[in-house]
Design a protein with these regions (language model features):
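PLP-dependent aminotransferase class I/II
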Residues: 1-140
Length: 140
């Protein structure tokens, strides 16, 4: 069994450059399709990032609606698995001491962040459908 795991690991490493390039291509496509939407803020990747997703801040509107969750729900209804970007450690029950300074910006925006898929298996037709749904729901 160890040989099988080793073979899988070697294959993944051999294709790493190809996978990163494919992910970056999808990030560029999201930037082209969603970059002009004033209801969204695409979080840029740092130079050399191998991020698996495109993180997007869905800017809240006036009122109490959770627009980011509406985007996630609409994508889920269309068959796409998308979720919030992260939950700050200090907000997880039992980990409230995992913050050394207050994080007002993170505390304010974390619930607005979602991750859009960028994996090599994501076809550009699906990427365009995802972008269309995100655009429509975020714009309202």
């Amino acid at each position: 069994m160890a040989n099988v795991y080793a073979a899988v690991a070697v294959t993944l490493v051999e294709r790493l450059t190809e996978h990163i390039a494919a992910r970056r291509e999808r990030v560029r496509a999201y930037q082209q399709l969603l970059g002009q939407n004033e209801s969204l803020k695409l979080i840029p990747h740092r130079l050399g990032s191998a991020c698996l997703t495109q993180v997007v801040r869905v800017l809240p509107r006036k009122g109490s609606r959770d627009v980011a969750m509406e985007v996630v729900n609409a994508l889920s209804a269309a068959g796409y698995k998308v979720h919030g970007s992260y939950l700050p450690l200090h907000l997880i029950p039992g980990l409230s001491a995992c913050v050394w300074d207050r994080l007002p910006y993170a505390d304010r925006i974390w619930s607005d962040l979602i991750e859009l898929p960028c994996g090599p298996a994501l076809g550009f037709d699906d990427l365009a459908k995802i972008a269309t749904i995100v655009d429509a729901v975020a714009t309202g």
